[in-house]
């Protein structure tokens, strides 16, 4: 007990010294998160051995200390990677590297030098929301390379422009209006500029699977005056689908916004078939279509079938898990999975994106595949792995080694 108390005192004293120093070195911020990790590991060990108090300090629950230790590990990984980038020599304060700021919109990025943007709904000055425009946003692309960009605002929302030309929106004004407005009208005020939306047309219901059609959006430019108001004629903004994507004809700039939050199939086999859909017909020796791959959840029968027939049977069933989220979140998850001795899987991919059928534009968030030997191994994986809240999970079948 005395060893635990002295060890805890030493860790907390080192933390207090770092807080008082108010260092701007990224090495000190990494040290701070490593000390937090050690502190939570000590709490976890104490609680697991029945210790409820260390000195005057109550020992948190096992779940709490475990979650905080994992958070500290994640922050260390991000900061060590950032340290090795060209931006590692910049000033980094405790606030710049705090967990709260890291998760603030745009989530999963480091940010500096924010300014406030106000959105007024229904022409009511008492009905407003505020959002932050960041002068510097540090994010990792799909190749795990850190980039430094700035936030921007246009008639659609607040975004940061990635180096490959994508507008990554972290605030969509139409979504905010659906929460806080009764008429759907909003006005945006930023640095003396103001523009508002005017609903002049309505969108007609579209068939399932048909692409949404969006009208052009003017961008708030530096030439706007303090009293100038720009009207926006729009039809529909996405917000409920898997990917919120708006295409601007005027700027020819691809737009995307990453959704956050875990989503997992709850069906026993994870097939994800909607109610009313029929099981695909299957004749002996038939070749499964792209849609049918993974749709039959049975193990191919053993026997004296030809190699071709067995390969065709196996094409229906190989199990995978597709994880979707920010590239840096997936990188951290992949690191944890490969380092873990408690989780079994066959192989894991690097991060990747879907692309548009007509060009090379990336669509939506990054993805990563985890392949398994059989469905039993996948079920154990889903039971044992605590996935971050910032990723979504989909189950499927995939043929290949």
UniProtKB/Swiss-Prot annotation:
GO terms for cellular component: host cell nucleus. HAMAP family: PPV_E2 (MF_04001). Binds DNA as homodimer. Interacts with protein E1; this interaction greatly increases E1 DNA-binding activity. Interacts with protein L1; this interaction enhances E2-dependent replication and transcription activation. Interacts with protein L2; this interaction inhibits E2 transcriptional activity but not DNA replication function E2. Interacts with protein E7; this interaction inhibits E7 oncogenic activity. Interacts with host TAF1; this interaction modulates E2-dependent transcriptional regulation. Interacts with host BRD4; this interaction mediates E2 transcriptional activation function. GO terms for molecular function: DNA binding; DNA-binding transcription factor activity; nucleotide binding. This is Regulatory protein E2. Phosphorylated. Pfam families: PPV_E2_C, PPV_E2_N. Residues 254-267 have a biased composition (Basic residues). InterPro entries: E2/EBNA1_C_sf (IPR035975), Nucleotide-bd_a/b_plait_sf (IPR012677), Papillomavirus_E2_C (IPR000427), PPV_E2_N (IPR001866), Reg_prot_E2 (IPR033668), Regulatory_protein_E2_N (IPR036050), Regulatory_protein_E2_N_1 (IPR042503), Regulatory_protein_E2_N_2 (IPR042504). The keyword Magnesium does not apply. Its main location: host cell. It comes from the Viruses.
């Amino acid at each position: 007990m005395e060893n635990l108390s002295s060890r805890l005192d030493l860790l907390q004293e080192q933390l207090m010294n770092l807080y008082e120093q108010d260092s701007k070195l990224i090495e000190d911020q990494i040290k701070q998160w490593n000390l937090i990790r050690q502190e939570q590991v000590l709490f976890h060990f104490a609680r697991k051995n029945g210790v409820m108090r260390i000195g005057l300090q109550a020992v948190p629950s096992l779940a709490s200390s475990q979650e905080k230790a994992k958070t500290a590990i994640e922050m260390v990984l991000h900061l060590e990677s950032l340290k090795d980038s060209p931006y590692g020599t910049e000033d980094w304060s405790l606030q710049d590297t705090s967990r709260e700021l890291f998760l603030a919109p745009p989530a999963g990025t480091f940010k500096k030098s924010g300014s406030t943007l106000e959105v007024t709904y229904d022409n009511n000055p008492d009905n407003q929301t505020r959002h932050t425009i960041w002068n510097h946003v540090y994010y990792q692309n799909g190749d795990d390379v850190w980039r430094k960009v700035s936030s921007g605002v246009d008639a659609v929302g607040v975004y940061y422009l990635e180096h490959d030309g994508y507008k990554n929106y972290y605030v969509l004004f139409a979504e905010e209006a659906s929460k806080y407005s009764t008429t759907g009208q909003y006005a945006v005020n930023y640095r003396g500029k103001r523009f508002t939306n005017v609903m002049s047309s309505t969108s007609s219901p579209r068939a399932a699977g048909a692409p949404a059609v969006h009208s052009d959006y003017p961008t708030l430019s530096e030439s706007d005056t303090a009293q100038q108001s720009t009207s926006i004629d729009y039809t529909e903004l996405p917000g409920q689908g898997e990917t919120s994507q708006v295409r601007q004809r005027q700027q020819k700039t691809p737009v995307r916004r990453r959704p956050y939050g875990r989503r997992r199939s709850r069906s026993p086999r994870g097939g994800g078939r909607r109610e009313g859909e029929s099981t695909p017909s299957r004749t002996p020796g038939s070749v499964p279509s792209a849609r049918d791959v993974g749709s039959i959840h049975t193990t191919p029968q053993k026997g004296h079938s030809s190699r071709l027939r067995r390969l065709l049977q196996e094409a229906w069933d190989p199990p995978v898990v597709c994880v979707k989220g920010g590239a840096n979140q997936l990188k951290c998850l992949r690191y944890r999975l490969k380092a873990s001795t408690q989780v079994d899987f066959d192989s894991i991919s690097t991060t990747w994106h879907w692309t548009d059928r007509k060009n090379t534009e990336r669509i939506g968030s990054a993805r990563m595949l985890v392949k398994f030997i059989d469905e039993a191994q996948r079920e154990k994986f889903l039971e044992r792995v605590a996935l971050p809240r910032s990723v979504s999970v989909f189950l499927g079948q995939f043929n290949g080694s």
